[in-house]
């Protein structure tokens, strides 16, 4: 009798994706982040569902309902903080996952890579709208500032902003629609993740050497299921340390003040995972230019495959490109720091230099280093 795992129409799909999947024998811990992102998404959907049962998307009661969740709902505080800090874990895994893709040349799987970029944009949009929901000072002013950026679009900008707001300012209509979008988007993310996985399994996974591994494959289960569980335990450990010991470490104190349209906070800044893009936005004095730079800071990932000049796939054996990659990582950390600083000297200058370096490294230095390495190897 055929094993039900291999014959049942539905279980067969799961089997071919997670159990009998042929995987390269040498993929490292950097390949763990895909499964960790799946776990983060499930965690966010579950905690979000329980929060939505008690949350009210009305400007008069939103802030109070979040307080009510933390004070009166059974274990509401832990659900709320797991959701808030789970988003931070989600982005840590996302950045690691994208970084690994760039380092090991996974962007040569163009369909998988492009769906991944779409996923990144969707997750960022979801996180932004989620930040607005508690209706604290930073929620309100963050929503006002970021949505206002769309007014920089020529001709249709102002109409577009008012259409998104549902009025002439960020108000009840804005909060209600942001809640609706924040609820539906994670399910769209889950569907996109399935497409992402589908495209990946068409080609098979990349590996640290960047070579074809068809001649040396091992089953995903038990080897990589066990390996992924180790990563999962470390992720849960980090999350729970954050939630139980310093849940507000990554938040903003201003968000514990109810939203007040008449009082602007001294420094409006988004959550830490958007600070690098926010720093790039602020480094350009022109509004439209800043918005374009902001979008391009993420969209630039789409042209990374076109800028791949090296005849080797990954950076495993390319020291020059490795140096540039870690320069880029250091640059992004600098931008993250600058995004949280006030707009004054010397932070403005540092931000502008770091923004120029970000685009210069990806668009010019990395393709040149690939060509130099080809020449050094006489290829």
Curated annotation (Swiss-Prot):
<keyword id="KW-0496">Mitochondrion</keyword>
<comment type="similarity">
    <text>Belongs to the cytochrome b family.</text>
</comment>
<feature type="binding site" description="axial binding residue">
    <location>
        <position position="182"/>
    </location>
    <ligand>
        <name>heme b b562</name>
    </ligand>
</feature>
<feature type="binding site">
    <location>
        <position position="201"/>
    </location>
    <ligand>
        <name>a ubiquinone</name>
    </ligand>
</feature>
<keyword id="KW-0830">Ubiquinone</keyword>
<dbReference type="InterPro" id="IPR005798">
    <property type="entry name" value="Cyt_b/b6_C"/>
</dbReference>
<protein>
    <recommendedName>
        <fullName>Cytochrome b</fullName>
    </recommendedName>
</protein>
<dbReference type="GO" id="GO:0045275">
    <property type="term" value="C:respiratory chain complex III"/>
</dbReference>
<dbReference type="GO" id="GO:0046872">
    <property type="term" value="F:metal ion binding"/>
</dbReference>
<feature type="binding site" description="axial binding residue">
    <location>
        <position position="97"/>
    </location>
    <ligand>
        <name>heme b b566</name>
    </ligand>
</feature>
<dbReference type="InterPro" id="IPR030689">
    <property type="entry name" value="Cytochrome_b"/>
</dbReference>
<dbReference type="GO" id="GO:0005743">
    <property type="term" value="C:mitochondrial inner membrane"/>
</dbReference>
<dbReference type="InterPro" id="IPR048260">
    <property type="entry name" value="Cytochrome_b_C_euk/bac"/>
</dbReference>
<dbReference type="GO" id="GO:0006122">
    <property type="term" value="P:mitochondrial electron transport, ubiquinol to cytochrome c"/>
</dbReference>
<dbReference type="InterPro" id="IPR036150">
    <property type="entry name" value="Cyt_b/b6_C_sf"/>
</dbReference>
<feature type="transmembrane region" description="Helical">
    <location>
        <begin position="320"/>
        <end position="340"/>
    </location>
</feature>
<keyword id="KW-0679">Respiratory chain</keyword>
<comment type="function">
    <text>Component of the ubiquinol-cytochrome c reductase complex (complex III or cytochrome b-c1 complex) that is part of the mitochondrial respiratory chain. The b-c1 complex mediates electron transfer from ubiquinol to cytochrome c. Contributes to the generation of a proton gradient across the mitochondrial membrane that is then used for ATP synthesis.</text>
</comment>
<feature type="binding site" description="axial binding residue">
    <location>
        <position position="83"/>
    </location>
    <ligand>
        <name>heme b b562</name>
    </ligand>
</feature>
<keyword id="KW-0812">Transmembrane</keyword>
<feature type="transmembrane region" description="Helical">
    <location>
        <begin position="33"/>
        <end position="53"/>
    </location>
</feature>
<feature type="transmembrane region" description="Helical">
    <location>
        <begin position="226"/>
        <end position="246"/>
    </location>
</feature>
<keyword id="KW-0479">Metal-binding</keyword>
<feature type="transmembrane region" description="Helical">
    <location>
        <begin position="77"/>
        <end position="98"/>
    </location>
</feature>
<dbReference type="GO" id="GO:0008121">
    <property type="term" value="F:ubiquinol-cytochrome-c reductase activity"/>
</dbReference>
<dbReference type="Pfam" id="PF00033">
    <property type="entry name" value="Cytochrome_B"/>
</dbReference>
<feature type="binding site" description="axial binding residue">
    <location>
        <position position="196"/>
    </location>
    <ligand>
        <name>heme b b566</name>
    </ligand>
</feature>
<dbReference type="InterPro" id="IPR016174">
    <property type="entry name" value="Di-haem_cyt_TM"/>
</dbReference>
<keyword id="KW-0472">Membrane</keyword>
<feature type="transmembrane region" description="Helical">
    <location>
        <begin position="113"/>
        <end position="133"/>
    </location>
</feature>
<dbReference type="Pfam" id="PF00032">
    <property type="entry name" value="Cytochrom_B_C"/>
</dbReference>
<keyword id="KW-0999">Mitochondrion inner membrane</keyword>
<feature type="transmembrane region" description="Helical">
    <location>
        <begin position="178"/>
        <end position="198"/>
    </location>
</feature>
<feature type="transmembrane region" description="Helical">
    <location>
        <begin position="347"/>
        <end position="367"/>
    </location>
</feature>
<dbReference type="InterPro" id="IPR005797">
    <property type="entry name" value="Cyt_b/b6_N"/>
</dbReference>
<keyword id="KW-0813">Transport</keyword>
<dbReference type="InterPro" id="IPR048259">
    <property type="entry name" value="Cytochrome_b_N_euk/bac"/>
</dbReference>
<keyword id="KW-0249">Electron transport</keyword>
<comment type="subunit">
    <text>The cytochrome bc1 complex contains 11 subunits: 3 respiratory subunits (MT-CYB, CYC1 and UQCRFS1), 2 core proteins (UQCRC1 and UQCRC2) and 6 low-molecular weight proteins (UQCRH/QCR6, UQCRB/QCR7, UQCRQ/QCR8, UQCR10/QCR9, UQCR11/QCR10 and a cleavage product of UQCRFS1). This cytochrome bc1 complex then forms a dimer.</text>
</comment>
<keyword id="KW-1133">Transmembrane helix</keyword>
<dbReference type="InterPro" id="IPR027387">
    <property type="entry name" value="Cytb/b6-like_sf"/>
</dbReference>
<keyword id="KW-0349">Heme</keyword>
């Amino acid at each position: 009798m055929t094993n039900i795992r291999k014959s049942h129409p539905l279980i067969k799909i799961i089997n071919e994706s997670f159990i009998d999947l042929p995987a390269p024998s040498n993929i490292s811990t950097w390949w763990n982040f895909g499964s960790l992102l799946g776990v983060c998404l499930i965690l966010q959907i579950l905690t979000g569902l329980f929060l939505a049962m008690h949350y009210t998307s009305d400007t008069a009661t939103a802030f109070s309902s979040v307080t009510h969740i933390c004070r009166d709902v059974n274990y509401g505080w832990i659900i709320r903080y797991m959701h808030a800090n789970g988003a931070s874990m989600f982005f840590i895994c996302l950045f690691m996952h994208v970084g690994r893709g760039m380092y090991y040349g996974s962007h040569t799987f163009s369909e998988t890579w492009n769906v991944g970029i779409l996923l990144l944009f969707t997750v960022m949009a979801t996180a932004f709208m989620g930040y607005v929901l508690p209706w604290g000072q930073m929620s309100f002013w963050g929503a006002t500032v970021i949505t206002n950026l769309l007014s920089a679009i020529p001709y249709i900008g102002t109409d577009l902003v008012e259409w998104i707001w549902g009025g002439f300012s960020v108000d009840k209509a804005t909060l209600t629609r942001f809640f609706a979008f924040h609820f539906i988007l994670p399910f769209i993310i889950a569907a996109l993740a399935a497409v992402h996985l589908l495209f990946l399994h068409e080609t098979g996974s990349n590996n640290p050497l960047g070579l074809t591994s068809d001649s040396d494959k091992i089953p995903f289960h038990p080897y990589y299921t066990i390996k992924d569980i180790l990563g999962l335990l470390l992720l849960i450990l980090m999350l729970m340390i954050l939630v139980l010991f310093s849940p507000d470490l990554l938040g903003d104190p201003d968000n514990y003040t109810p939203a007040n349209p008449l009082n602007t906070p001294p420094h409006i800044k988004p959550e830490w995972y958007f600070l690098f893009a926010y720093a790039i936005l602020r480094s350009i004095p022109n509004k439209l230019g800043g918005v374009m730079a902001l979008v391009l800071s993420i969209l630039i990932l789409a042209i990374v495959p076109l800028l791949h000049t090296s005849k080797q796939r990954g950076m495993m054996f390319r020291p020059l490109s490795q140096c540039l990659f870690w320069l880029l990582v250091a640059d992004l950390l600098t931008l993250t720091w600058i995004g949280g600083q006030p707009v004054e000297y010397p932070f403005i200058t540092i931000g502008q230099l770091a923004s120029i370096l970000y685009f210069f490294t990806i668009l010019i230095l990395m393709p040149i280093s690939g060509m130099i390495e080809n020449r050094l190897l006489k290829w």
